[in-house]
Amino acid sequence: DYWAATRYYFDCILGPFRRPFMQNGIKTARQLQPAIICPGHGPVLDTGIDEVLSAYDAWCLEDLPFPNKTVVIAYVSAYGYTAQLAEKMAEGVRDAGADALLFNLEKAGQAQVAASIGRAQGLLLGSPTILQEALKPVWDLTSCLYPAVHKGKLASAFGSYAWSGEAVPHLLEKLRQLRMRVPDDGFKVRLCPTQEDLAAARAYGEAFAKQL
């Protein structure tokens, strides 16, 4: 679908430069009134130029911060254990008076999640550890995050593991590379979380949100 691809391209490639660079470019394009636009990246525009520019105009304004303090909790879960942690952390975030947006990365659109992260004040990334690594959907999401856009956001990682649990420290390192504020060593449990683990996950979510 053309518009779905156009939106995906905007979110992952153009979005980080939406203000002021994209807005200035749109203004210049409208002043020049070109019959064709040949960008250095992306499709050539030879029809529907005004429609595309209008869409870009609107999308440039979509990343205004959420009115209430918000934490995006984006996760992938192999056996449901990391999902249980995510749900409890969301409860804890809400206990602290903040909003929690839960995204299962196997179902949610990457562009939608990235856009929500751009508007939120906090981010929790969740993944189990398989073959000593976090799972691909989480890494795919981080490829749409940029220091220029997301630096300074409060962020951490969590997950269930069976053996060595490298997913959480690997994700924390990526969050630091994005120049986000990483306040701790994340949260991880071995295999299926116990009731004590779930209570601790809820408390972790609350403590995290109180730092926003």
Identify the role of each PLM range.
Residues 53-59:
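Membrane-embedded alpha-helical bundles that constitute the cytochrome b-like, heme-associated redox core
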Residues 77, 104-107:
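Short, well-ordered turn and helix-capping elements at secondary-structure junctions
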